[in-house]
Amino acid sequence: MRALPTTATTLLGVLFFPSASRSQYVRDLGTEQWTLSSATLNRTVPAQFPSQVHMDLLREGIIDEPYNDLNDFNLRWIADANWTYTSGKIEGLGEDYESTWLVFDGLDTFASISFCGQFVGATDNQFRQYMFDVSSILKACPEEPTLGIQFGSAPNIVDAIAQDPSSPTWPEGVQITYEYPNRWFMRKEQSDFGWDWGPAFAPAGPWKPGYVVQLKQAAPVYVRNTDLDIYRLGQINYLPPDQTQPWVVNASLDYLGSLPENPSMAIEVKDLQSGEILASRPLTNITVTEGSVTGVTVLEGVDPKLWWPQGLGDQNLYNVTISVTDGGNQSVAEVTKRTGFRTIFLNQRNITDAQLAQGIAPGANWHFEVNGHEFYAKGSNLIPPDCFWTRVTEDTMTRLFDAVVAGNQNMLRVWSSGAYLHDYIYDLADEKGILLCSEFQFSDALYPTDDAFLENVAAEVVYNVRRVNHHPSLALWAGGNEIESLMLLLVEAADPESYPFYVGEYEKMYISLFLPLVYENTRSISYSPSSTTEGYLDIDLSAPVPMAERYSNTTEGEYYGDTDHYNYDASIAFDYGTYPVGRFANEFGFHSMPSLQTWQQALTDPADLTFNSSVVMLRNHHYPAGGLMTDNYHNTVARHGRNDPGRAGLLPDAQHSVRPRGQLQRLVPRDPALPGGPLQVTNPVLPAGQRAARTPARVPVLAARGHLAGALVGGDRVRRPLEGPHYVARDIYKPVIVSPFWNYTTGALDIYVTSDLWTAAAGSVTLTWRDLSGKPIASNGGLPTKPLPFHVGALNSTRLYRMNMKQQPLPRHEDAILALELTATGSLPNTDEEVTFTHEQWFTPAFPKDLDLVNLRVRVEYDAPLGKFAVEATAGVALYTWLEHPEGVVGYFEENSFVVVPGQKKVVGFVVQADETDGEWVHDVTVRSLWDLNEGE
């Protein structure tokens, strides 16, 4: 069930022409006939609304799929042109309405609007809702009106702004250009101008719905936005809420029209599943400001079922109906929003004496607490699922979020920039228990801070904070991506004398402006001025800068904020001394090649399916070109050279493949295999609840951006196969795991057990050395032959065993693999039932390139009665065994990138999300392993 976005009368207005009896009429602009034109195109074509120019041109056959081949370059003429959307005659608008408005939920980006041939207004912010009063224009219009929206070329407009002598400039080398320059002058999706993971199409168009709204005096108002804030009594954004306090419901409606004097407000809270009415009562402290009405109530004696992230409990949801009435109890407005009761708090407070006594490292916290409970954040970074939002569907996001849940993830960081997510995406996250750490759309740049710019972005922030605040999946607002952790460092290096000035500019917008705007519109959500910080020293809401950031005021041996780490030098990937230590891993990763199936969707010429083809190389945007050049070979070669695991001596080298396509086919599963090591132990740091030791214990982690990142191919990106990191993360995101932590520089190998349960767990781990033919190694290589018992505390890790591989009595490290098999008992969060947990890990004491791999004779067969796939290796241990499904089916394997030992059959299921083969795809599933990197084709 979806939340009703507006009142029932508003919805009826979309379906019927106005009549004398109806006091409000709303017409969806998507029902009109639209055309698209441009002097560059020299023709007019049919269009849709909402839409974007590229999508209308694609539908009409003017261009082919933008993601194909090098269309990133070939279609730049679209971004360089101005485009006009023109409606047909809008018939049937009423003449007896006092006011007529145009309401646009999203115009991308620089638009000039005309109605009945008259200029109405202009827009310059993709992320704002715009309203224009066209009452006088309509009354003077001699015929049925038409609506025109002209979109200017964003690249040309920001270039002109940059050339204006009054525009700000920054020290040389600070601002980061990916393809189109000057993106910091526009309030538009920053990745539209290119990023290191995707193309630069710079789309334009009416990307969200629009309406004609007609109102009568002293009649129901049109609700254009709603802020529903649910929190504990006394809750403050930056302090942990008292879970014993009753719930507070604060409801605010933004409207068009005129409210009667002394309006009343009330709410009804209904259980979505049972239909039971939990509460029905009036709101108090009614305040009316320009265009908004707000009221509040305390739900004394009301005990709703809590909403929990997936894996921690149920996703209990409620419909809250907010009504506004006049003195005669006549309805003025009514809105229903689906929501949940939960508290979510980002704890950045100093480590307490009690925590120190538990062995927690000193410094400051950086972790989330839901309903008063600390928990491990397990997830990914979410970048735009498509460069063109108008073709992202609910089905698209459902499949993506189903994969998130199947991957044992409970949180996504909504990376900026990106765009603010549509409401239906938050709805899906509410249903599936996925927390969404959201950010304001500022990324990897310094931005203007003049009054006009700040006024523009303030309206953007307020609108979006209020719009999504009712969603229980909303976990955080951050000011932007890497502003503090990267941009301030760059400006300090480029111009040390000006550094204090730019710190002041940063604080002016992200702290002094944004923090109060967040706190004024929500009591339930925490705020951080940047995605990655060292946390704050103090908060004083009466100070000019209300949050005093820590910056570099750190003490050695203490740990503070979250980390953001990229190092593409594969030769030091397992030197864990190179990794940062913090409380939370916010973003990290290792670039990898997509699957061959993905490449086949994007490349129309099979001859381009080679590792070093110009198309493959130029589609790799890391390192970015830094401009509009179309020959970025130097940077792409530099990236491949540094983080190619084969060249770094980690994996077998597939460069010798006889046939170019075979070379590519062997390279593409290789990179996803590598994170099977680093992903488990990247960012070995200490969250609250862990001991003060440098361990691989599970950090609250938003994992490598590559998990869900990248609008690389296909309009429906999630139709492509899931890559290796998703499956590796799924495995290590299980509730209780065993991890080998090997520092190859010292030889130390530590075996840890990590639990994200809220109570202690106990069990045992069996360690077994085998050679690569699968046979046990004599005397178990010096390890105990009996299972090793363990007891691990809540949200904690315990070191089970320590050895030094340089002293371990193994015949040959190149012919050895260690199996780690865990069995444990414990209780899942919010349950008392005892559950048995199992987990399996593997470790090789030599890099895969140096292993004595044998011809495994690995095979896969479909077991029809079971509906699953059986994988066997008859001649040797199959490392990083990889199942791949053919085209024509969409879904994911329940496991992948696993180890198969001779004599042990691996049975793997597959979740089908869409099937165009009538089930025949099961006969074309293929299997490969690390051995295949040694083989030519």
Swiss-Prot record:
Catalytic residues identified in the record: E482
Primary subcellular site in the record, as a coarse category: secreted
InterPro entries: Beta-gal/glucu_dom_sf, Beta-mannosidase-like_N2, Beta-mannosidase_GH2, Beta-mannosidase_Ig, Galactose-bd-like_sf, Glyco_hydro_2_Ig-like, Glycoside_hydrolase_SF, Ig-like_fold
Pathway(s) where this gene product acts: Glycan metabolism; N-glycan degradation
GO molecular function list: beta-mannosidase activity
Gene Ontology cellular component annotations, sorted alphabetically: extracellular region
Residues with attached carbohydrate: N42, N82, N250, N285, N319, N329, N350, N553, N612, N743, N796
Location of this chain's protein in the cell: Secreted
Keyword annotations of the record: Carbohydrate metabolism, Glycoprotein, Glycosidase, Hydrolase, Polysaccharide degradation, Secreted, Signal
Catalytic reaction equation(s): Hydrolysis of terminal, non-reducing beta-D-mannose residues in beta-D-mannosides
Top-level EC class: hydrolase
UniProt temperature dependence: Optimum temperature is 70 degrees Celsius.
Annotated signal peptide: 1-23
GO BP field: glycoprotein catabolic process; polysaccharide catabolic process
Function, as annotated: Exoglycosidase that cleaves the single beta-linked mannose residue from the non-reducing end of beta-mannosidic oligosaccharides of various complexity and length. Involved in the degradation of polymeric mannan and galactomannan. Releases the terminal mannose residue from mannotriose and is somewaht less active on other mannooligosaccharides.
Subunit structure as annotated in this protein's UniProt entry: Homodimer.
Name of protein: Beta-mannosidase A
Gene name of the encoded protein: mndA
